[in-house]
Amino acid sequence: MKIAVSACLLGDNCKYNGGNNYSEKVAEFVKGHDIIQVCPEIMGGLPTPREPAEIVNGIVKHKDGTSVDAEFRKGAELALNKVITEGVDLVILQSRSPSCGVYHIYDGTFSGTLIPGQGIFTKLLKENNIKVLDVSEL
């Protein structure tokens, strides 16, 4: 099986704060499979580290109101194209991210409050009938 994984889950230091979300569960789950790492935010041209971003009324913004929506959408499209081109069967995504959140995202107030919703990349994957899993489902 070919599996795409949020790069931060495999230890890539691509999170907004320069860190990662390495998951031993993910590393074990993907052993023996063909793996493709993706970080839509990096693919969209955003630096590491970078200001935190949340989806505010459908637009990805920094806390000061600066829009980074174009970068998030560009990265999501590029990551989707990579997933499709590579013939990926499953995508494992980081929880709560404005790119990769599967079930919940932050509410746009930068208060740490979660609401039901999906990240930009996750929406594109689902619209293209690509199977996704939140890391918490492993």
Regions found by a protein language model. Give the residues of each.
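Extreme N-terminal starter segment of soluble prokaryotic enzymes
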Residues: M1-A4
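Short, well-ordered beta-to-alpha junction loops that form the rim of enzyme active sites
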Residues: C8, Q94-S97, E137
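Short N-terminal binding/cap micro-motifs at the start of the first secondary-structure element
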Residues: G11-G18
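Short, surface-exposed acidic-centric catalytic microdomains
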Residues: N21-K61
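Short amphipathic alpha-helices and their capping/turn segments at secondary-structure boundaries
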Residues: Y22-I36, G75-L90
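Divalent-metal-activated hydrolytic enzyme cores
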Residues: M43, A53-I55, I59-L78, K82, ...
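Short, compact, well-ordered microdomains
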Residues: G87-I92, C100, I115, I120
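Internal, conserved structured core segments that host functional sites
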Residues: Q94-I105, T109
